[in-house]
Amino acid sequence: MVRMRCREEQAPTGKSMGECIISLRGWHPALAQAELSALFPTGRVEQLSSPRLARITCKGDEQEFTIAAGIEATFQHGVNTPWIDEASLLNEIKNHLQMYSHGNASCAVHAWKHGEGISDCSRTTLAGNIGGVLSRMNAVIDLEQPERIFGVLLDGHSQTVTYGWLMDGGPKGDSSTGRRASQRPFFKPVSLEPRLARLAVNLACGPLAEGTCLDPMTGTGGFTIEAVLSERTAVGIDLDLEMIEGARRNLEWAGSNVDPFVQGDATDVRASLPEGFPVPFSGTVLDPPYGRNSHGSMDHSILLQKTLLSAADVTQGGLVLILPSEPRPDCIERALSRDERPPLKHYSWQELEGILESTSWTYQKAWYIAVHGSLGRVLIFATNALQD
């Protein structure tokens, strides 16, 4: 990472709509693209020449940028251009800085890469030369605490360069690494990693203003914890009191003092909710607890059908359903076509789609998530008739 700082005249700070370019995390770009479209349904999200880059129309101050699991960085008024040579790029950046100056805030240059980057371009040299451009524009170089960062991203997949002022101080680290499921006081080996749980909530529920997240089989509380930490309202339900008490401890450990957990039955959500609780929910997230089925000997298919029917009764929005599958090669740059989907552990795909249809959910897309050599997961997105 190379950083330099400067000072320039103040730029306008209005909240008019403009274009941003989003840099996405590499662990699953296709899911990150889907999450982005869900969080910004009116943003005209467009994938660029790399699966880790997208263009979006936005104001630039939406809270959704700060809660997305898949966003690495946001370039305000960003530009994505094919790599030609450094001289051409520096000329482009000079013109861009004349149009979008930073103002009196201190600033830095941060250059990084996706994949192998661009072989004949040194990030260190490029960042230094951009600092030179800023100096010739009467910028004061300051290598300490930037108030704004000018970003330059070299993408190896597309051989393009993305540049612009970065929102919220530049590329952000993956905050979920500090709250791994295995670090919680109440842990089960089946717990989802927080970044996947966060993405699932965002995909199912959409923008923050849409409403409350339903987690009808909360288990150790992963989905509900991520919803609450995103400042969503949420309800986590489980039939097992041990799970409810453990999920409460986990949420308190994560830094929240709210209590969104309810002991109840996933197959009868409406009856499990506190009296007068407002419905519909904006989305449902479901990772059925196979292997520790709190509903005893109930058949997998019957349990899933009853739960999905109960959720559809109180949800107007999306469903994210995560199911175990046979392993298959990684597929992180696109959703699975129907003939690419791996066999599920407990259902045939025909049976699953029949269950969805019979419970008023419409299958939309599925993505594969690798777990280990003998197990995978499939994340399925569906919508209900009310949303359709």
Descriptions of predicted regions:
Residues 5-71, 114-121, 125-126, 136, ...:
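Class I S-adenosyl-L-methionine-dependent methyltransferase catalytic core
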Residues 55-101:
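Conserved AdoMet
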Residues 92-99, 139, 350-354:
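Intrinsically disordered, low-complexity boundary segments flanking structured domains
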Residues 103-106, 210:
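Phosphate-coordination loops involved in phosphoryl transfer and adenosine-cofactor binding
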Residues 109-113:
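Basic, glycine-rich polyanion-binding accessory segments appended to enzymes
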Residues 140-146:
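Short acidic low-complexity segments
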